């Protein structure tokens, strides 16, 4: 099957890899290329196609390997794979790269529900150290004075804002946001259906019918078209015999004729897939479960502005007071707007020294999704960390990314 490589993607990858193998006098080349973007847009697959076209060998690390029960193992793994790749360049005499898939999933911090471990710190520190000293990468407990070959590092992820800020600065990591435009998407989808007799016009209509869907959606659509034939095959041999027929049969694997890949059939199947997506989006069961776990009923909270507390005054007369006297109206309005959009809220603090490195820490332990909880949590945070920076963070629970970061208190106590 002839898959399509987007020229823009290929150029970016080829330039970064080649530049790291050249000796450019007086030029400091970033070692890491960070490819980020929406889920399912083919970042990893486009990398694989580009590597194959360029004849580049790849050493892979998964984001799931960046955590371990033993502190230091993931950092050691990165150093070991880097040294192995440098040795491959030397032995085979060809370009080789180290690729880390889903770096943000393994080393990022999405919210206070994501634990920040020793391994997370060590992974970030190790990548920073390698980016600064690419020819001097040592294993813990040993030292080799022989300089290594420089190994370009390619990392992929969805949201690099969750990573440690010094790691992604321009001198260490070059960023490339991958969101294929229509022509690129038509080319990629055309490659997916290249063997199925779909015309260029049909591919364009299919893409235009589902403009908000990722590349992975169309790949899954092609797989779904085979479901009808597989269902007929299962009915033909029987549920009780399908295991022996497929796995342990002298007849060989079953053969299937080419399914119906007409545009109308594709759009019909795609609509079923979109309907399943919408059911998940509208169910919001996780919100209900979280509310039950916190002992709250599944009902929207009343606006804070309508809540008043009565405290006895010195003369014995009860006077109503605002629920949040020292939180500005602008901050309260921003909280309402974030929650109205279906987002979650959390608060973070940092002292003056750690502010320069971006080492923020959470003020609470849960997502806040009700205005009354947000106000009370913020009041507690401001009171407890009076001499520090405090910021409000809005989180999109569907995309698992931050949409708002606003500093609402500074060390001098101003809001």
Curated annotation (Swiss-Prot):
Gene induction: Transcribed in light but much less in the dark in both normal air and 1% CO(2); the nitrogen source has no effect on transcription. Constitutively expressed when grown on fructose. Transcribed separately from rbcL-rbcX-rbcS.
Keyword Cell membrane assigned: no
InterPro entries noted in UniProt: ATPase_AAA_core (IPR003959), P-loop_NTPase (IPR027417), RCA-like (IPR044960), RuBisCO_activase_AAA_helical (IPR048571), RuBisCO_ssu_dom (IPR000894), RuBisCO_ssu_sf (IPR036385)
Coiled coil regions, renumbered to chain: none
Pfam families: AAA, RuBisCO_activase_AAA_helical, RuBisCO_small
One term of GO molecular function: ATP binding
Keywords: ATP-binding, Nucleotide-binding
Gene3D superfamilies named among the record's database cross-references: 1.10.8.1070, P-loop containing nucleotide triphosphate hydrolases, Ribulose bisphosphate carboxylase, small subunit
Binding site for ATP: 37-44
Its job: Activation of RuBisCO (ribulose-1,5-bisohosphate carboxylase/oxygenase; EC 4.1.1.39) involves the ATP-dependent carboxylation of the epsilon-amino group of lysine leading to a carbamate structure.
Family: Belongs to the RuBisCO activase family.
Protein name (database record): Ribulose bisphosphate carboxylase/oxygenase activase
Native source organism of the sequence: Anabaena sp. (strain CA / ATCC 33047)
Lineage, broadest ranks: Bacteria, Bacillati, Cyanobacteriota, Cyanophyceae, Nostocales
Gene designation: rca
């Amino acid at each position: 099957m002839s898959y399509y490589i987007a020229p823009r993607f290929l150029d970016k990858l080829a330039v970064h890899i080649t530049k790291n193998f050249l000796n450019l006098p007086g030029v400091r080349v970033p070692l890491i290329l960070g490819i980020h973007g929406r889920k399912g847009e083919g970042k990893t697959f486009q990398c694989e196609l580009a590597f194959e076209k360029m004849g580049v060998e790849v050493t892979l690390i998964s984001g799931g390997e960046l955590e371990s029960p033993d502190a230091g193992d993931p950092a050691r793994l990165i150093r070991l794979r880097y040294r192995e790749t440098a040795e491959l360049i030397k032995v085979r005499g060809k370009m080789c790269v180290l690729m880390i898939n889903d770096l943000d999933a393994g080393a990022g911090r999405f919210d206070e529900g994501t634990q920040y471990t020793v391994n997370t710190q060590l992974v970030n520190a190790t990548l920073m150290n390698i980016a600064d000293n690419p020819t001097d990468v040592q294993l813990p407990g040993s030292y080799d004075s022989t300089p290594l070959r420089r190994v370009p590092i390619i990392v992929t992820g969805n949201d690099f804002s969750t990573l440690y800020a010094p790691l992604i600065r321009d001198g260490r990591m070059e960023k490339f946001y991958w969101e294929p435009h229509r022509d690129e998407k038509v080319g990629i989808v055309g490659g997916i259906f290249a063997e199925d007799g779909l015309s260029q016009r049909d591919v364009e209509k299919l893409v235009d019918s589902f403009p908000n869907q990722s590349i992975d959606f169309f790949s899954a659509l092609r797989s779904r078209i085979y479901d009808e034939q597989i269902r007929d095959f299962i009915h033909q041999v029987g549920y009780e015999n399908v295991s022996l027929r497929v796995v342990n049969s002298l007849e060989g694997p079953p053969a299937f004729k080419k399914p119906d890949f007409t545009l109308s059939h594709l759009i019909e199947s795609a609509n079923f897939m979109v309907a399943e997506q919408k059911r998940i989006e509208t169910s919001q069961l996780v919100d209900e479960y979280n509310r039950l776990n916190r002992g709250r009923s599944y009902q929207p909270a009343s606006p804070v502005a309508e809540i008043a507390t009565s405290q006895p005054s010195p003369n014995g007369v009860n006077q109503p007071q605002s629920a949040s006297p020292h939180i500005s109206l602008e901050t309260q309005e921003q909280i309402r707007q974030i929650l109205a959009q279906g987002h979650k809220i959390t608060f973070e603090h940092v002292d003056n020294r750690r502010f320069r490195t971006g080492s923020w820490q959470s003020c609470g332990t849960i997502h806040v999704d009700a205005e009354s909880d947000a106000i009370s949590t913020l009041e507690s945070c401001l009171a407890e960390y009076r001499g520090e920076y405090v910021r409000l963070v809005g989180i999109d629970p569907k995309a698992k990314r931050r949409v708002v970061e606003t500093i609402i208190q500074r060390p001098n106590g101003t809001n």
